[in-house]
Amino acid sequence: MITAEMVKELRERTGAGMMDCKRALVETNGDIEKAIDELRTKGLAKAAKKAGRVASEGVVTSYIHGGGRIGVLVEVNCETDFVAKTNDFKQLAYDIAMQIAASNPEYLNREEVPQEVINREKEILKAQALEEGKPEKVIEKMVEGRVEKFFKERCLLEQAFIKDLDKSVQELINENIARMGENITIRRFARYEVGEGIEKESCDFASEVMSQLK
């Protein structure tokens, strides 16, 4: 059975259209890796074809919000200096910086999350499920689902893009890879907030960033 999650994963990894991804999954009986090969053969896996190419050019972009209360630096890479200087690429980098300011990700992707952090989250989530009186047989699936939610909230590439919540940041990047014709990656980022780590009256700066987009 081909699920919406499978189609979404294939889209994120290839940048191909939704119907093309669905057809490829049907033709390969739901095998993601074979579906990628199928799309590449047909010339549709634009992002997958470019993912292995070296992206050593790019920009370091900053975003400062609220009179200097939140600051972000992010390095976004592409293959050539020509693309790095385009307005489209600069706008992409700026949008990613705003995303980081608003959504406060802790990691770039799920591969960066330490195993001990994942294990701790699982223990907490399992304890919560037991506290809710859930049957043992459904707890494992519940924990799996909540760990996925954890990744989508804490990992930049899996977060919903603040300007279009129907797509992830990874899908945004894949769209730009397809349009610009070069591999694009986020190498690293840093986010600073005034008074971070100091006990103070709560102030939701992230919501302020989000409100600017409305």
UniProtKB/Swiss-Prot annotation:
GO CC entries: cytoplasm
InterPro entries for this protein: EF-Ts_dimer_sf, Transl_elong_EFTs/EF1B, Transl_elong_EFTs/EF1B_dimer, Transl_elong_Ts_CS, UBA-like_sf
Pfam families in UniProt: EF_TS
Protein family membership: Belongs to the EF-Ts family.
Source organism, top-level taxon: Bacteria
A molecular function (GO) term: translation elongation factor activity
Gene3D superfamilies per UniProt: 1.10.286.20, DNA helicase RuvA subunit, C-terminal domain, Elongation factor Ts, dimerisation domain
Compartments in which it is found: Cytoplasm
Function: Associates with the EF-Tu.GDP complex and induces the exchange of GDP to GTP. It remains bound to the aminoacyl-tRNA.EF-Tu.GTP complex up to the GTP hydrolysis stage on the ribosome.
Name the record gives this protein: Elongation factor Ts
NCBIfam families: tsf
Gene name linked to the record: tsf
Chain intervals for the UniProt region annotation (Involved in Mg(2+) ion dislocation from EF-Tu): 80-83
Keywords: Cytoplasm, Elongation factor, Protein biosynthesis
Originating species: Syntrophomonas wolfei subsp. wolfei (strain DSM 2245B / Goettingen)
